[in-house]
Amino acid sequence: KETAAAKFQRQHMDSSTSSASSSNYCNQMMKSRNMTSDRCKPVNTFVHESLADVQAVCSQENVACKNGQTNCYQSYSTMSITDCRETGSSKYPNCAYKTTQANKHIIVACEGNPYVPVHYDASV
């Protein structure tokens, strides 16, 4: 079974590119990372930074998560991210996404030992 940390990496990490390569980025990535296999995941964010830099956020600014839990952390610096949002015309199994590139602070929930990101909460 996929661990929470591994799932975070599959769903949110793309260190191989510094930003979204094209407007088709989300359509390709959401499919290749298995987020359209049983339904279209409505919203997802990819982070274009090194895994080490994203894992380091777990020791940065402690903030409250959207759900009220206290194990969320906000990055000190902005990071290159790509937001993928399902379009109005998207219909499973032909999931369609709008690709939006941004530089924002990320907020992740961290758990475990080692203490690593397991959930992408928000970007600000």
UniProtKB/Swiss-Prot annotation:
Query: InterPro entries this protein is in?
Result: RNaseA, RNaseA-like_dom_sf, RNaseA_AS, RNaseA_domain
What tissues contain this protein?
Answer: Pancreas.
Active site annotated at which positions? 12 (proton acceptor), 119 (proton donor)
Q: Name one GO biological process term.
A: defense response to Gram-positive bacterium
Enzyme nomenclature, EC number: 4.6.1.18
Q: Which PROSITE patterns match?
A: RNASE_PANCREATIC
PTM info? Swamp breed ribonuclease do not bind carbohydrate, but there is evidence of a polymorphic form that does.
Positions of region (Disordered): 1-24
Other information? The sequence of the river breed (Italy) is shown, the other type is known as swamp-type (Indonesia).
Q: Which family does it belong to?
A: Belongs to the pancreatic ribonuclease family.
Give the protein name, as stated in the record: Ribonuclease pancreatic
Q: Provide the species name.
A: Bubalus bubalis
Q: Which gene underlies this protein?
A: RNASE1
